[in-house]
Design a protein with these regions (language model features):
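Zn2+-dependent metallopeptidase catalytic domains
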Residues: 1-181
């Protein structure tokens, strides 16, 4: 962690999102009929670098933040939201997921596989995959704006907490508290 610099994150996210988009495009454009393996398992396995970078970034941003890291977070919030929207609003990809979901009872899936299929289908539906194109576009805009506002709010809370504190100058003010505190 000590070698990671805030400036590393934006290009790392850019590369990871490009790779993830390529994986998603290959799944969506697969000419074979959708199967659990070529659609759901492939979708679940996609974006590993993106997920790893996201976890590291979000943990650092929440616990060991800095002005540079917060600037990267503000820049990336709408872009990562747009990335998620692009996947969840991909009509060809959703058609594959939806086709499998429609015949899930006949697929002979293990309980974990069925749960993954149902969860992914629900994620697409909640993101607006069934909406008309204009409504999907608007839902995406709202999601990107919410990502920006959520980031701003979280950063404001962190800044507020960093400036808050109680100075105890009289030991009697600690009366009644356990010694471990």
């Amino acid at each position: 962690f000590e070698r990671i610099e805030p400036a590393h994150f934006v290009p790392a996210f850019d590369a990871a999102m490009r790779a993830h988009r390529a994986e998603i495009a290959a799944i969506a454009a697969n000419p074979d009929p959708p199967t659990f393996a070529n659609t759901i398992a492939a979708l679940d396995a996609s974006g590993r670098a993106y997920v790893r970078i996201s976890h590291v970034f979000r943990n650092l941003a929440a616990s060991a933040t800095s002005p540079d890291l917060q600037a990267a977070e503000r820049e990336l919030a709408p872009r990562t939201a747009a990335h998620a929207n692009a996947i969840l609003h991909d009509a060809a990809l959703f058609a594959r997921v939806d086709a499998l979901h429609g015949r899930r009872d006949a697929l002979g899936l293990a309980p974990e596989e069925r749960r993954l299929l149902e969860r992914l289908h629900l994620d697409f539906a909640h993101a607006g995959a069934r909406l008309a194109p204009e409504a999907r576009r608007r839902a995406g805009e709202i999601g990107e704006r919410l990502a920006t506002l959520t980031t701003t709010f979280r950063q404001n809370v962190l800044q507020d907490e960093a400036t808050q504190g109680v100075v105890i100058t009289d030991e009697r003010d600690l009366a009644g508290l356990p010694a471990s505190l």
